[in-house]
Amino acid sequence: RLKKYAAVSAIALAGGMTTAAHAADSVNVAFFLEWATPNQISKVDKAYDDAMGVDVKWTDFSTGVQMTEAMLAGDIDIAYSQGLAPFVTAIQQGAPLKMVSVAVVYEANDCFVKDGLGITSANASELEGKTVAVPLNTMADFSFRKQMAALDVDMSTMTIVDQAPADGAVSLADGSVAMACIFGGASAKAAGEVGKPIM
């Protein structure tokens, strides 16, 4: 059995944020709503607003890739739990982002196969030629590729659809995909109601 990958979610700052924050009237923060991280208590209590002396505006995102795009567009100043893979990918491409802390370390991602297909780790090659939902450039994507390699599944034969976890869970439920790779509590619960982990 392949071990689940432990993923680190980073707290990242957009370039210039450290110097611009002092003059800003507000700070825009990205976060994952379905991850029960402690910052959400402080968000409700306005603790960050009080500590920073500015209005903190929170925006929920489905993936760390979306957070990165919003930061690069100048719409987001801080990403809370952006995800290791999106952060590293952005840095490798020269993005002016800086990791300031680790938000949470979590047990990463499952790939759920639709119930009724009869596909398990024992006959995973039957996934070849099928459509799967994967949130690309995330730890779920990394885990998917490692699992397929371990199960000797030829990914070049698969149609890989880039979907956020919540959308992937819906596609799994309606039969649009044979497998969906998921992170996040609510999405994993939804996928688990209509499918089972391949490993």
Segments (PLM) and residue ranges:
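Short, glycine-/small- and polar/acidic-enriched structural segments
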Residues: 24-154, 159-163, 178-185, 196-199
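Bacterial N-terminal signal peptides that target proteins for export
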Residues: 1-9
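Extended hydrophobic/Leu-rich segments
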Residues: 2, 21, 188, 194-198
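Sec/Tat signal peptide C-region and signal peptidase I cleavage site
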Residues: 16-23
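Loop-centered beta-sheet repeat module
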Residues: 168-191
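Bacterial N-terminal signal peptides
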Residues: 8-16
